[in-house]
C-alpha cells in the first residue's frame, strides 16, 4: 500500500519500481536452496530466528532509502535474508506433525500470514492518510513486530518435540517418528530429475507469478487505473489477501481429507486442478470489465481460487523430500520466487510501453492454467532418492 507513495517521493518510474519489487524476489529465489539446506542442517529454531530478525532490520532500513539504487540494494538484501522461512517451517511440520495433518498446517500458516497482510494493507492506508503519505514511518513501525516475534520464538521453540517440556508422552506418540534428520549428502541429482519435483517447481512458478501481482502492483492498479480513493483502495487491497487466506486454509484442510479417502496422489492433486482454472477465468473477466468494483471483486475471488494448490504443494514437498524436506521445499520455493521476480518486471515494462494492465493480467491467467496442467503429473508418493540407498521413515500414514 505504501509503494505508490514511495515511488512518487523517490521519483521512480514504473519500470524502476518493477525492478525494486523483483530485486526482493530474485534474492529470495537465489538464496532459498542454501537456506533450505541450512534449515535441514541447523534446525528451524535457529534458522527462523535469524530469518525474522534479518527481515525486521531490513524493513527498518527500507524506510531510510534515498533513491533507486539504495532501495534496490536494500530490497535485495531483504530477500536474501528472508529466504528460508518456508523451508524452516517445513522442518517444523516434518518433525512436529503426523503426515496427514501437514496440508492443513501449511494452509493455516499461510492463511495467518495472509490475514496479517490484509490487516497491514488497511492499517498502512490509515497511517498514510493520517500522516500525509509518510511511508518511511510505516516501515519503522512494522520492523518492531518481527524483533519481538524472533525473541519469543527462540525462547519458546525446540527443534524436537521430545526436547520441549510441555509435550507429553501421548502427544509424542501421536506425532510419531515424523521425518528423520538429514542423513548424509543431499541426493541433488534426484532432486532435479524427479518428475514430481520438476512439476511442483513449474506449478509454483505460475502460482507465485500471479500472487505477486496482488502483493506488489494491486494498490497502484486500484488507485491509478480503477480510480479508488486511498481509504477505499485500502479495503479493496485487503480483499484478495482475505480470499487467499480462506482459499489456502480450506484447500489444505480439504487436501488432508482427500488424502485419507483417495490417497496422496489424488488427494494432493485435486484442489489445484479445481481451483486454478477457475482463477484463470476470473482474472480474465476482471481485466475485461469496465466496472471498478466488479473488477476488484473478481480479482479477489481469482486470488482465492489460485491458492488451492499452495498448501497441497507444500505438503507434497514434505512427502517427496522426506529427510531432505528443507532442500526440497527450498527448491520449489526458488522457482516460485522466480515467478515472483518475473511478474513485477513484466507489469512495469507493460505499463511503460503500453500504459495498460491487459497484458499483465492475461499473463496471470495464462500461468494459472499452466499451473493447473502441472498438477496433472504431480505424484506426492514419488519420493526423491527412492532408487538410492537412503533411509525413509514415516511414509505409511495415508500413503496409497
Question: What is the predicted function of each stretch?
Answer:
Residues 109-164:
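Helix-loop-helix hairpin linking two adjacent transmembrane segments in secondary transporters
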Residues 46-61, 266-284:
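Structural signature of the two symmetry-related core transmembrane helices
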Residues 11, 43, 64-70, 81, ...:
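Helix-breaking motifs and short loop linkers at transmembrane-helix boundaries and internal kinks
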Residues 74-113:
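Cytoplasmic helix-loop-helix junction between adjacent transmembrane helices
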Residues 103-122, 128-129, 244-248, 333-343:
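Glycine-rich segments within core transmembrane alpha-helices of 12-TM secondary carriers
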Residues 194-251, 310, 314, 318, ...:
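Extracytoplasmic gate region of multi-pass secondary transporters
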Residues 30-69:
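Conserved MFS/SLC helix-loop-helix module at the cytosolic interface between two early adjacent transmembrane helices
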Residues 129-144, 229, 267-270, 349-367:
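A membrane-interface helix-boundary motif in multi-pass transporters
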